[in-house]
């Protein structure tokens, strides 16, 4: 890992890539870039209240502090279902879901946004990675007594792949599942949706 260095250029070579930073050149097989999005809301009227993280504050119907003005998607923080706390989750599924809620509330506020589990999946190299609900590290910020368990699921017989490695995060007192992460060379992205359903009440 190389922190606090600005990437100046990336050059593809026969053996991988050369990453030029403000401090050095790094030869490697591949690179993974983690980018963090944040809403650019400087243009907003000052009457519209914001949260501490500068996202737009909304009520359960996604209406802002100004009547008949709603906000959706990457501009808002959403409720985290398992712990009833808000968090910023710039995901396309949250944008679509919040947009649908607002569309239903334009004439009359009748649909509440139930929150998000931040369910996501991707493929990095040969591995599929998926997550829903709380991670173990995020659990440090919440009052529940959390525990985790590692689970291994063999590959289905007709799929000649590898096992699925998973981690379940749960409330130690109530035994309620609060989060899950999966990793496998097999496509496990659909399985995270099943785990997300188990977290929802």
Predicted regions located by residue number:
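General small-molecule cofactor/ligand-binding pocket signal
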Residues: 2, 70, 147-149
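A conserved short coil-to-beta-strand element within the FAD-binding core of flavoproteins
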Residues: 3-15
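A structured beta-alpha segment of the ubiquitous adenosine-cofactor-binding alpha/beta core
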Residues: 7, 20-25
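Short, surface-exposed charged micro-motifs
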Residues: 9, 61, 167-169
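Short, hydrophobic/aromatic-rich segments at coil-to-beta transitions
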Residues: 15-19, 143-146
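FAD-site-proximal beta/loop scaffold in flavoenzymes
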Residues: 25-101
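Mid-to-C-terminal Rossmann-like scaffold of FAD/NAD(P)H-dependent oxidoreductases
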Residues: 78-186
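A short, polar/charged loop-to-alpha-helix boundary motif
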Residues: 186-201
């Amino acid at each position: 890992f190389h922190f606090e260095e600005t990437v100046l250029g990336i050059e593809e070579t026969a053996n991988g890539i050369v990453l030029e930073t403000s401090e050095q050149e790094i030869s490697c097989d591949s690179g993974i870039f983690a980018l963090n999005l944040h809403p650019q809301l400087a243009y907003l009227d000052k009457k519209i209240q914001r949260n501490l993280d500068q996202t737009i504050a909304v009520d359960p119907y996604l209406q802002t502090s100004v009547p008949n003005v709603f906000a959706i998607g990457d501009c808002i923080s959403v409720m985290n279902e398992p712990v009833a706390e808000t968090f910023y989750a710039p995901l396309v599924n949250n944008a679509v879901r919040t947009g649908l809620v607002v569309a239903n509330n334009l004439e009359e506020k009748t649909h509440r946004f139930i929150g998000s589990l931040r369910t996501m999946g991707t493929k990095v190299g040969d591995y599929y990675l998926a997550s829903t609900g709380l991670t173990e590290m995020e659990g440090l910020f919440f009052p529940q007594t959390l525990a985790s368990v590692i689970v291994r699921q063999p590959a289905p017989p007709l799929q000649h792949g590898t096992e699925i490695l998973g981690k379940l995060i749960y409330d130690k007192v109530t035994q309620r599942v609060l989060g899950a992460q999966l990793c496998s060379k097999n496509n496990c992205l659909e399985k995270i949706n099943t785990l997300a359903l188990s977290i929802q009440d």
